[in-house]
Amino acid sequence: MKNINPSQTAAWKALQQHFEQMKDVTISSLFAKDDQRFNQFSATFDDQMLVDFSKNRITRETMEKLQALAKETDLAGAIKAMFSGEKINRTEDRAVLHIALRNRSNTPIVVDGKDVMPEVNAVLAKMKQFCDRVIGGEWKGYTGKAITDVVNIGIGGSDLGPYMVTEALRPYKNHLNMHFVSNVDGTHIAETLKPLNPETTLFLVASKTFTTQETMTNAHSARDWFLSTASDEKHVAKHFAALSTNAKAVGEFGIDTNNMFEFWDWVGGRYSLWSAIGLSIALSVGFENFEQLLSGAHAMDKHFAETPAEKNLPILLALIGIWYNNFFGAETEAILPYDQYMHRFPAYFQQGNMESNGKYVGRDGKPVDYQTGPIIWGEPGTNGQHAFYQLIHQGTKLVPCDFIAPAISHNPLSDHHAKLLSNFFAQTEALAFGKSLAEVEAEFAATGKTPEQVAHVAPFKVFEGNRPTNSILLREITPFSLGALIALYEHKIFTQGVILNIYSFDQWGVELGKQLANRILPELAGDEKVTSHDSSTNALINRFKSWR
């Protein structure tokens, strides 16, 4: 990938000038001027997804200038580089090929002169065989009973993705009960294990190196819990599998290396649900549905790689995000799924975006002079409406929002879904168009009150509007459409990282805290007073020691 500071490009300077013309333009005025605005600023994908970005503070000229920025920063070249297996993760000297994991066309993808697809397909075949045995009851625990519960032990990408997807696809789940343990806080593993039966529980230990502190601490506690009933260590092999590449450590733990599922250095943690890390997904919904998830993502990969930028959904959403983050000064983006099954989707892309693009050093190794990744947050609707929407509607912060909803519910109870979707449609309309003082006074007048009687309260009921949103309407949340939606956001993040001249696929920011924790851990062992840190850290450690 090229090293181009976006703020020094002609396109960026043109956008700065354009912003001066646009900063006071309202969304309502843009709709008033153009009754075809929706048609111009919306697009569909595979008759499964409608993306409406018309309720944004953009014009055709805005998008043309943003597209010019993408062109000047060589986005097209970067997309080709990723899809062709170039080592675009330069700080770790790795290719970035989560797209290979879901390459349903099976066309060769070459890294270091070697086609990776045969290995990818071999692991998928091994996963299918394993899933068929466990789901079908052929796999037995040490007392001859079939598996009823699966516990995935991982953290970060080895937890967030599988947990999010298994929750989103609960309507497709089989009889197996899925559990996820990530936090090194002993409460997490203890509470998870309380209702489980060691005779019918299978553990998946997800750690590429088999050395991740949190994961291995939990794995050893799970092993101890299991052996407190099973006693004989030879039984571990019937109740533990590994998602790892460290065969030696896996074997020493007691896991049969035939039940070790590998993945590769070119699979980043937060993009790993498509790999063997997704084994918990396949066990939960069946391997055929896991393949549909891969197929949906592959369809979006093709869209991203082949569709012109002007109609390319990940690129369009990425450019709009840069517009708000760097020109309007918006520091956050909210992801608001109007589907309870999707309740972990915002948290998943909180990691996906913030760990990818939360960087202050450009690809040239120098601090940047512009904004990079935004803060990502969100909760399911309508819960959020009764929590934080107040600030989005009437606060002083600009919070661009993505609203996501399915047209068809998996649980068509009474009129629940109609009420849910009425809120979905109403919120974006309210955020865009607001309510003027005149409208507020007219509403009061309709109840028989005079302007004098309501003067003290009317200003507080005014909604300025002009709050930007994207609406993503899915036909239904299926494995295929969910795969496409996840890939849409993945490629949006990649696009922004390319344009903002940062490396999106490393995460050096997680290292310092881990290093210091490893230094502090032995200091917590005794009762001696600690003096090796700053006064604040020393005081906190010493108070902890006195209270424990």
From Swiss-Prot:
It is an enzyme of class 5 (isomerase). InterPro entries: G6P_Isomerase, G6P_Isomerase_C, Phosphoglucose_isomerase_CS, SIS_dom_sf, SIS_PGI_1, SIS_PGI_2. The active site is at E355, H386, K514. Keywords: Cytoplasm, Gluconeogenesis, Glycolysis, Isomerase. Gene3D superfamilies: 1.10.1390.10, Glucose-6-phosphate isomerase like protein, domain 1. Its main location: cytoplasm. It comes from the Bacteria. Its EC number is 5.3.1.9. CDD domains: SIS_PGI_1 (cd05015), SIS_PGI_2 (cd05016). It holds the Pfam family PGI. It catalyses: alpha-D-glucose 6-phosphate = beta-D-fructose 6-phosphate. GO terms for biological process: gluconeogenesis; glucose 6-phosphate metabolic process; glycolytic process. SUPFAM superfamilies: SIS domain. GO terms for cellular component: cytosol. It is found in: Cytoplasm. One of its GO terms (molecular function) is carbohydrate derivative binding. Pathway: Carbohydrate biosynthesis; gluconeogenesis; Carbohydrate degradation; glycolysis; D-glyceraldehyde 3-phosphate and glycerone phosphate from D-glucose: step 2/4. Catalyzes the reversible isomerization of glucose-6-phosphate to fructose-6-phosphate. Belongs to the GPI family. This is Glucose-6-phosphate isomerase. It comes from Yersinia enterocolitica serotype O:8 / biotype 1B (strain NCTC 13174 / 8081). The gene is pgi.
